[in-house]
A protein has these predicted regions:
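N-terminal pre-triad scaffold of radical SAM enzymes
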Residues: 9-63, 79-88
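Short loop/turn motifs at secondary-structure junctions
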Residues: 35, 69, 94, 99, ...
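FAD-binding FR-type
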Residues: 85, 108-114
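Conserved AdoMet/S-adenosylmethionine-binding subsite of the radical SAM
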Residues: 113-261
Length: 265
């Protein structure tokens, strides 16, 4: 029997309307090469399950610490999770005994069939709204083999496909998605290599080159610019971003407002 591909996913949101046209199902992939301080989904960064703790929901029962097989959780003097130890855990029993749902585990394995089954549930809404699937994360291209197979299956089913991407992967990986992506939602965070690396750990030249190559290959692109105070909001950088987008002949730009939704995570 052929071995099934496994992808690490931390959320699947149906009836989404903000990441691509129409009504969409957003599939959130684990794993990202960048470490943006303002990331709205920090639980996406590691390519394996990781704990999420919500202090507001915690009732202080201590069951999680008592159950933890890695001795990774301490509740006194403050609630602390040793993530390095937690990464060795295979059971994540701590979350299963948390009745208040203050402790959850972000990420679990899915097969392509499992994801596709969920995506297809809203097929009738895709047809009436020009919607479909949006893969996001994290950076979905990190899991290239699983991603391409999922996209291929969606195209075979007549489902429109979009990807929200930071472009922080090799061109060899990104180009494999070209036959199966209808629209790329590309982040353009900064054009200065020193500043981008300092704030995200990313290689600006690689990111910008990948976007340019997508444009040169005829990809449909929406450039998305997250406005981060003190990072890319000065006049010189805004103009530089604008010149880059114009040089790629990308006709559409979306400005994303700054937020701190990732802070509680």
């Amino acid at each position: 029997m052929e071995k099934q591909l496994i992808g690490w996913i931390f959320d699947i949101q149906r009836f989404s309307v903000h990441d691509g046209q129409g009504i969409r199902t957003n599939v959130f992939f684990k794993g990202c090469p960048l470490r943006c301080d303002w990331c709205s989904n920090p639980e996406s960064q590691l390519l394996r399950p990781q704990p999420l703790y919500d202090e507001k929901k915690c009732i202080g029962c201590g069951h999680c610490a008592q159950t933890c097989t890695q001795n990774a959780i301490t509740t006194q003097p403050t609630y602390t999770i040793d993530v390095a130890r937690c990464m060795h855990c295979e059971t994540h029993s701590c979350a299963s005994v948390c009745y208040a749902k203050a402790l959850t585990i972000a990420g679990r394995p899915y097969t392509v069939d499992e994801v596709l089954r969920i995506v297809k549930k809203d097929a009738m809404f895709y047809g009436t709204s020009n919607g479909g699937l949006t893969v996001t994360g994290g950076e979905a291209v990190v899991q290239t083999e699983f991603l391409v197979e999922l996209l291929k299956r969606c195209k075979e089913a007549g489902i429109h496909t979009s990807i929200e991407t930071c472009s922080a992967c090799s061109w060899d990986k990104i180009r494999q998605t070209l036959p199966y992506i209808d629209e790329y939602l590309c982040d353009v965070k900064h054009t200065d290599p020193v500043k981008l690396r300092a704030e995200t750990g990313g290689d600006a030249q690689m990111l910008l080159d990948n976007i340019r190559k997508l444009a040169e290959n005829g990809a449909k692109i929406l450039a998305r610019v997250p406005m981060i105070p003190g990072f890319n909001t000065d006049e010189a950088e805004v103009e530089s971003i604008g010149r880059f987008i114009a040089s790629c002949k990308i006709p559409r730009v979306e400005i994303l407002n700054f937020h701190r939704l990732g802070v509680p995570k």
